[in-house]
Design a protein with these regions (language model features):
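Short, intrinsically disordered low-complexity segments
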Residues: 34-56
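N-terminal acidic leader/helix
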Residues: 1-25, 33
Length: 56
């Protein structure tokens, strides 16, 4: 199992980039789980999502 952390900006462009990255990951790996979105601390403009994958 491999754990991937995706960090992306909290704006429309960042959400689009996140969705595209997740689609690419799904094409390459078997996705076991995707966490909820974790907002950055304080005034951070970024969020994180954790993805558990395994090789196809």
């Amino acid at each position: 199992m491999i754990k991937i952390r995706l960090t992306f900006s909290n704006d429309k462009k960042g959400l689009i980039e996140f969705a595209e990255a997740l689609d690419n990951i799904k094409r390459t790996f078997n996705v076991l789980s995707v966490s909820k979105v974790y907002k950055g601390r304080g005034e951070s403009k970024f969020s994180n999502v954790y993805i558990d994958v395994e090789n196809k």
